[in-house]
């Protein structure tokens, strides 16, 4: 006969009591969750993200084609007529450098205010009689080139740009010596007088101050005609550069009757 087995583990009253106390087995399903620390990811906002507040758009001033009355353009402001701005510091203007005179620049001659330059000669206003006589007294009555005395027919004195006078016959020879460049070299100072017009030597003024001091016999035409004993000295031959085709004077008329001269 088999022997009676002893009480099994968990069996008997103690095991029954323990099984009653344990109750039914409950299975709970746990989900895995990962905890992220914010200091490892600074781009993740810790607080709830809200859109930024809209900023007011600045209003742009309309462009002006012309500056206003109170606006100063430095490069265009000149003189002492600039309006003073309120609150702007006033700085004294820089001292201007004195301009060099004509003598310092190599031009010793200072033209007077009432001097008028007409073509190649200078016309000065008529001074008093004493001043005019003293100024004209220093001018010679003879041509510096040929040495002949001036007269009103063939040897009228004409003024060059250097204010020296030469008779018309000598000027004709000097003018024909360089017809290409149309300039005359003064026989006294060697300065050149350029003729810019088509009138030739007629563009040079007659020195009336010398004519007023000539003797009476130099103011009349010779007895043998306008040219005296010089048959080759006709109006067209000698003074063709002055009159040209428009000359209206003839052999018996004085040269002053020419409409161009």
From Swiss-Prot:
GO annotation terms (biological process): protein autoubiquitination; protein ubiquitination
PROSITE patterns for this protein: ZF_RING_1, ZF_RING_2
Gene3D superfamilies, sorted: Zinc/RING finger domain, C3HC4 (zinc finger)
Superkingdom field: Eukaryota
InterPro entries cross-referenced by the UniProt entry: RING_finger_E3_ubiq-ligases, RNF208_RING-HC, Znf_RING, Znf_RING/FYVE/PHD, Znf_RING_CS
Keyword tags: Metal-binding, Phosphoprotein, Zinc, Zinc-finger
Modified residues annotated as Phosphoserine in this record: 102
Region (Disordered): 83-106
Signal sequence range: none
GO-annotated cellular components: cytosol; nucleoplasm
ZnF locations on chain (RING-type): 143-190
Ranges that cross the membrane: none
Example GO molecular function: ubiquitin-protein transferase activity
UniProt keyword Ribonucleoprotein present: no
UniProt keyword annotation of Manganese present: no
Protein name, per record: RING finger protein 208
Species of provenance: Homo sapiens (Human)
């Amino acid at each position: 006969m088999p022997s009676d087995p002893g009480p099994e583990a968990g069996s008997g009253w103690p095991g029954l009591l323990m099984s009653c106390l344990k109750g039914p087995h409950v299975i709970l399903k746990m989900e895995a969750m990962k905890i992220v620390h914010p200091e490892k990811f600074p781009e993740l906002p810790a607080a709830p993200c809200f859109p930024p507040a809209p900023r007011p758009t600045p209003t742009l001033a309309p462009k002006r084609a012309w500056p206003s009355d109170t606006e100063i353009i430095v490069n265009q402001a000149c003189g002492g007529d600039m309006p003073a701005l309120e609150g702007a510091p006033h700085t004294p203007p820089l001292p201007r450098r004195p301009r060099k005179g004509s003598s310092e620049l190599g031009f010793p001659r200072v033209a007077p205010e009432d001097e008028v330059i007409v073509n190649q000669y200078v016309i000065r206003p008529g001074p008093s009689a004493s001043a005019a006589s003293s100024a004209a007294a220093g001018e010679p009555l003879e041509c510096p080139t040929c040495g002949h005395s001036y007269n009103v027919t063939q040897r009228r004195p004409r003024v060059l740009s250097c204010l020296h006078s030469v008779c018309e016959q000598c000027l004709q020879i000097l003018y024909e010596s360089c017809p290409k460049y149309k300039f005359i070299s003064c026989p006294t100072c060697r300065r050149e007088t350029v003729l810019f017009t088509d009138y030739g030597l007629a563009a040079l003024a007659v020195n009336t101050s010398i004519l007023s001091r000539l003797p009476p016999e130099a103011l009349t035409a010779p007895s043998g005609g306008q040219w005296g004993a010089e048959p080759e000295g006709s109006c067209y031959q000698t003074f063709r550069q002055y009159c040209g085709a428009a000359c209206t004077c003839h052999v018996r008329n004085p040269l002053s009757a020419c409409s161009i001269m």
